[in-house]
Amino acid sequence: MSKAHGSRPYRRHNVVIPRQQPEKEMNFVQQQPPPSDAAARQMMYPPNCQVGVQDPVYLAKEFNLLTLNPQQLEGSRHQQMAKGPEKSLYSQYEQKVRPCIDLVDSLRALGVEQDLALPAIAVIGDQSSGKSSVLEALSGVALPRGSGIVTRCPLVLKLKRDPHKAWRGRISYRKTELQFQDPSQVEKEIRQAQNIIAGQGLGISHELISLEITSPEVPDLTLIDLPGITRVAVGNQPQDIGVQIKALIKNYIQKQETINLVVVPCNVDIATTEALSMAQEVDPNGDRTIGVLTKPDLVDRGTEKTVVNVAQNLTYHLQKGYMIVRCRGQEEITNQLSLAEATEKERMFFQTHPYFRALLEEGKATVPCLAERLTKELILHINKSLPLLEKQIRESHQRATDELHQCGDSIPSNEADKMFFLIEKIKLFNQDIDKLIEGEEIVKKNETRLYNKIREEFEHWALVLTANTQKVKNIVSEEVSVYEKQYRGKELLGFVNYKTFETIVHQYIEQLVEPALTMLRKTIEIVWQAFTDTAKKHFSVFSNLSQTIQNKIEDIKTRQAETAENLIRLQFRMEQLVYCQDQIYSVVLRKVRKEVFNPAGKAAQDLQLKFPFPKDLPSMSSNDEIGVHLNAYFLETSKRLANQIPFIIQYFVLQENGSCLQKAMMQILQEREQYSWLLQEHADTSAKRRFLKEKIYRLAQARRALYMFFS
């Protein structure tokens, strides 16, 4: 044991980067500039993938390379002593560690985490929990320390073990990247980065700082250090600093892809720690939570058994359990105790402690054991997450591509190209208007074609005509009696007073005018909405062009509506003439008379009237005769109006309206000096297009990285 924990405490627990991993390719992916429009379309798909063809699944064939379960990993330690490193199971595991972590790190560097959650280990803890000491012990470098909030931005700590190279570090944030060879520079550079990002005060920021450390002494591991939890604002801190920090932490730990590393001091009641409460809130079963107990040397005498119970998962159960570590105290830091010496001192502490020795024997104590455990957990977590991640990247890439398609192409700068661009836009718009007019437009599920909406109005018009004729049937006897008493002259019984008939016809024809105009107005609105929606679909990103077209739609609608209304009113004025061809009217009249004289026969059809007559009279009264004529005339008039009014509306409101709009669109092309003005985009549209192109680019690179990893 002592030999394993010498001056290079992690060497036994860490791995060699396999030379065959595509590190150069990963770097190449990260260094490429965002592509042009044409290049972006090419980069949206991995090699050998075709647009429109179902995406290949890259994971199934090679994914078993990572399927090492925890028992295999644990057992590999003992096998390593008996077998050569190349043949041991643990050696196989080592060959997979660095590529897996590098893959996720490269995806994070590409910015994929803006779109999707990546597998990660997030480190959280209350202030003064010993979180910084744990990270220092793992990384081998001094991190910002002090009272109050020292971690003010999320810090991505990438640890890479390379036994063949000297220590080197790299810090990157925003557009800054610094490299250094002295570990003592780390604390200063982190503080400077935090001041630039979060300001000189005590505020915090969600913006990431990335610190990469390559050394023979560090484990292969990536952690995300989050600000320590505070309850009360101190000094110049914002009053809601506690709320801000909790919101930042929750943003990370609530993701299912995140393992939560909760740092808790041994000398406090574990049930009262805010960090563990937050972890339990987002992970009630503790499936994603690992507890790290710190400061075991500060526990009160007599409470050691309580600490052991916690470490053995008997007090506050977590599915992944607990680890316990002893890091450098403030006095040891002041005395410049090296991390290697601290590791040896830690080992001796646990080895000689009467209570905590058992935890060391169980592999639950010391920083080196923690490092090995975290590396193992991260690899298994990546293994578990990659299939879903590949699917999410593919689906997100497709959604972004579809959104970019809806935004349309970028506007050309050349005037001639602008003309062709506008011609194409107008051509596509006119084609869609044609489809609306012909009833051939493509509709989504639960949507209705324009023609069907108009047809519903026409069907309602037929019902109005039926109701009007039924009204005549219901009151004709009463009204004819009134007219006969007022207007009958010297005619004998049975002679029809034509004036009475004509007056009733005029009255009930007039009642149809307003329903016909109502149908016209509703149809106008239906067509206007369809044309407007089509214009928005094609031109919504161009505010000036969109407004110009909307004005044309309104103007043409008004003209066609006025023409249609005038023709409808003219039609009803003509209906006041009371006319029907003799040949047609005689047939209808004969049919009605037959039904009247045969009341026990076939039931009358729609728009037909039937009147009772005394069976002992061979002829009808004048009232009855007028009723028969009204029935016959309204039968024929209703047929005429049922077709004629919809004809007028359909022709002027749909056909002529659409045709005039298409011609007006072509006239826009004559205004060449207006092209630049017409094609001005909304500011947010160009920003959205730029954002989507960048998103598609990084997701395409992520897909390429996954493809290269599994190929």
UniProtKB/Swiss-Prot annotation:
It comes from the Eukaryota. Residues 225-228 are annotated as: G3 motif. Residues 294-297 are annotated as: G4 motif. The keyword Nucleotide-binding applies. It comes from Canis lupus familiaris (Dog). Interferon-induced dynamin-like GTPase with antiviral activity against vesicular stomatitis virus (VSV). Residues 326-329 are annotated as: G5 motif. This is Interferon-induced GTP-binding protein Mx2. SUPFAM superfamilies: P-loop containing nucleoside triphosphate hydrolases. One of its GO terms (biological process) is response to virus. PANTHER family: DYNAMIN, INTERFERON-INDUCED GTP-BINDING PROTEIN MX2. Keywords: Antiviral defense, Cytoplasm, GTP-binding, Immunity, Innate immunity, Nucleotide-binding, Nucleus.
